[in-house]
Amino acid sequence: MLKRTSFVSSLFISSAVLLSILLPSGQAHAQSASIEAKTVNSTKEWTISDIEVTYKPNAVLSLGAVEFQFPDGFHATTRDSVNGRTLKETQILNDGKTVRLPLTLDLLGASEFDLVMVRKTLPRAGTYTIKGDVVNGLGIGSFYAETQLVIDPR
């Protein structure tokens, strides 16, 4: 475990040094993280729809766990996927209201995490906040983002 931690630390430090050499200081500023959420089949309460959530850390450099947080009424399962790979039970926390992807790397804002929640019964009409963040890690930039998903009445 110590060897792996040492390797990850070395990789992080090497990336930071390389980045500081290659980029002029004016280009090294991170943008704010962004997140978007939309329903695919319907926006009406109590109907079934896929939900697509796209989170971009937009970091100059980040190394940590990407975390999606959902409000009451939304629950992730092992039928859902991130970037085309189905979620594992160990990635689904808090009764499906949190999805955590361990050890992710974003360099120069290149990473994008597309979470697809399959065939979800939409909750009652209202406005719901969905959040994305990089937690338990190191990095340069602001990683927190949230978006609103509006569910319409029937």
Curated annotation (Swiss-Prot):
Residues 1-30 form the signal peptide. Keywords: Secreted, Signal. GO terms for cellular component: extracellular region. It holds the Pfam family BslA. It is found in: Secreted. InterPro entries: BslB-like, YuaB-like, YuaB-like_sf. The keyword Acetylation does not apply. Has a minor role in biofilm architecture. May contribute to the surface hydrophobicity. Belongs to the BslA/BslB family. Monomer in vitro. NCBIfam families: hydrophobin_BslB. This is Probable biofilm-surface layer protein B. It comes from Bacillus subtilis (strain 168).
